[in-house]
């Protein structure tokens, strides 16, 4: 009988999930049924309470002794914290993600040994020093108001709690031993589910003389081929293959070959199919593109100081080397820029990140010699690196959609959430396991954190603000400022309680300059924060970074980070199959107007999730529910530029162009540079095939295709 009930329930779950396209309310129905199934599966292993879950996972060797002892000592209090009804907040696909990928399982039977609320409380206890602290963080997670990034969710309380999302490695020195040492570091970091960013700018270019052998170098490509194979071979904690992004400065003489690494044509021996690529672009290059001037390419062996310079110092040194004839060759700047745009158009890769903007305002670059050489795998982390220090960041994101009340943002609640999030992100620095000594040294000296957001599109839909409206720009900017104010204030409080980060004296904050001071006139609120920082210092050198959040946004049931929606109808994949999902805000509006019919659903799927050409949809809804492909990309750049004063690291900013051309891309990225953006992320383009004809009853119906090319993402940041 039990087996029959289980089969019936699974069929009911699949049926409800399949009906989400007709009515998004079916998502909650499917989620409740799945929650029952999870509870029964855990109960079959004797797990009904949180303390029983911890006992079972500890017996299975999955969690550390200290956590098991803490829970055993406070079992009654912790069991009483669990709110089983909080499972009702999940959408089906969010709960399915938790079940498939996050809940701890018995090593042999693979049955889950914790329920979703046990999972959240386990993560909270793994980061807490008391029951009260655990209750505080659990309250945020159980209401889906805030979630740490995936490494923390995977590993909090585990025997090896690798809690960090991102690792950034400076370029190896131009020596055989240094290069192979970097390979080893990357492998160890990738083994424990870290997303890797690495510069390769210091390594000599093709044709460079090797004095020890009197031969000539083959350049960076063979080294990157080896790195590519290593990254693919070392999978992340047994969950997926590793992921890395290589950064190269635009003056490196191998830049043109670098831009071809992801091409699908040409000599395969000079291609890398796993590495992501990013350009680390100085202002001098962009100025020469604007002026249609020549650009000089150098062998880093001949100009070893360029990689450690930025701003005016870089420009002076670059021009001096150029005047001295030290360049390998010259090329029209616009020709090279065009090749960069071609790489973006064809692969979505070769991301544009801006060296001078990244360094100019960073709190970490207050002392000469402290230089940011690259960003991370998702371009939202900007931290100082050196041979002795691998930059690290611990991430978490606030669900903005969970902070709405009475037709607006609940600012007091948002500030409270920020304060809690900052304290627990700081805690991860001390509790985390570090795969390399260089990572531990950097993280404990600088103590950077990356607090971000998700669900901005949900806020705009709820408040009926078109993404490119002046009101949306104003609200987005205020949200960023309020989060930064609360984060800096909290970090100053932590400094008073627990001490400043050890490198505080090297930062701009120690000289009285906070990140917003580089952009805007101070307000009374910032004056108060600045005074507190002057008294107490800061616990963390950096605080704000907007990560992609694809996975945790799915758990929270909101749209990713700061992005607009890609489509009003989209595919969700789970281990049990693929399902279509629909924009629930659009459906609610159409239902209220009596327009949500089967015919309209079919029209929406035929239109690739766009409402723009569907007859009968009111104009106000067409404006509000535009997709990323239908919004002016200038608006996305303007939103990012307006919030940047309050983001002391950076933001994962995808840009969207259905049919990219070199001319359009050239203008778009030049505009991003002029607006002072520090980084950009993927260029998203539509595939040639049509999207989403899945359940439309036509003889030639095709399975829904992914709406984005280049779907690789860094799970660590999510």
Predicted segment positions?
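Extended catalytic cores of very large enzyme megasubunits
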Residues: 1-718
